[in-house]
UniProtKB/Swiss-Prot annotation:
InterPro entries: Aldolase_TIM, TIM_sf, TrioseP_Isoase_bac/euk, Triosephosphate_isomerase, Triosephosphate_isomerase_AS. It is found in: Cytoplasm. Pathway: Carbohydrate biosynthesis; gluconeogenesis; Carbohydrate degradation; glycolysis; D-glyceraldehyde 3-phosphate from glycerone phosphate: step 1/1. This is Triosephosphate isomerase. Its main location: cytoplasm. Its EC number is 5.3.1.1. It catalyses: D-glyceraldehyde 3-phosphate = dihydroxyacetone phosphate. The lineage of its organism: Bacteria, Pseudomonadati, Pseudomonadota, Gammaproteobacteria, Enterobacterales. GO terms for cellular component: cytosol. Belongs to the triosephosphate isomerase family.
């Protein structure tokens, strides 16, 4: 049975003090839950190396929230996947809806980043999802196909071997309105079946997470669905006790 991936995306939040407290608490509680779960933390870039030093010894994995499309060069203010790897990052979030909406990242840019991550033997967490307008127009599957096709066109049929997908309906991100777990199950099954057309091995081993207003109150309803393989958690992951509750819930389904 595949392990569930429970990932904390802290976005632009945290301080040295709050992160130190969070990690001290987590390290004291987490050991019994690591057998059946893969736990990932994606802090702001400035805290990556500090977090790595705290979590590496207990087998919690480090993720970056974003990278540039370039590995080196005169690109002031950007962060390289190569540099991320050098400081212990294993996973990199690609194409989060906030990057798409606030930084105008399109499928082409996201595909370039995906390829960089794969070529460095890191693991991309590819975020895909539809807007509320697209959902109401019954275009969800069409949009997801377009987002997935951009990856296949750039990297080939085996693109999703050693990769993670996070389905995050854009209308649910940061709104407090989570999607219906049964509908999410259908979409996750669609994603896996679509990838299976290109590569059976990818589809059979693929982890597809759900992200969008996840809390300890609704996490179980998502995780009990057969094709929801984990969670990408935003605001709820900033609260140490809430995050641990979600991990415990995940562990109870294995």
């Amino acid at each position: 049975m595949k392990k569930k991936i429970i990932a904390a995306n802290w976005k632009l939040n945290g301080s040295i003090k709050t992160i130190s407290y969070f990690l001290t608490f987590l390290k004291s509680q987490i050991s019994s839950f690591l057998k059946n779960n893969i736990i990932i933390i994606a802090p702001p870039t400035v805290f990556l190396e500090r977090v790595y030093k705290d979590i590496n010894s207990i087998n919690i994995h480090l993720a970056a929230q974003n990278i540039d499309v370039n590995l080196t060069g005169a690109f002031t203010g950007e962060n390289s996947a190569l540099m991320m790897k050098d400081i212990g990052v294993k996973y990199i979030i690609i194409g989060h809806s906030e990057r798409r909406l606030l930084h105008n990242e399109n499928n082409e840019i996201i595909a370039k980043k995906f390829c960089l991550v794969k070529n460095l033997n890191l693991v991309p967490i590819l975020c895909i999802g539809e807007t509320e307008a697209e959902k109401k127009s019954n275009k969800t599957e069409k949009i997801l196909k377009e987002q997935l096709n951009s990856i296949f066109n750039s990297f080939g049929e085996k693109a999703f071997r050693n990769a993670v997908i996070a389905y995050e309906p854009i209308w649910s991100i940061g709104t407090g309105v989570s999607a219906d777990p049964k509908n999410v199950q259908l979409i996750h099954k669609f994603i896996k079946n679509y990838i299976k057309k290109y590569d059976i091995v990818s589809a059979e081993n693929l982890i597809v997470q759900y992200g969008g207003s996840v809390t300890s109150l609704n996490a179980g309803n998502f995780l009990k669905q057969p094709d929801i393989d984990g969670l990408l958690i935003g605001s709820a992951s900033l609260k140490h006790e809430e995050f641990l509750k979600i991990i415990k819930i995940s562990d109870s389904f294995l």
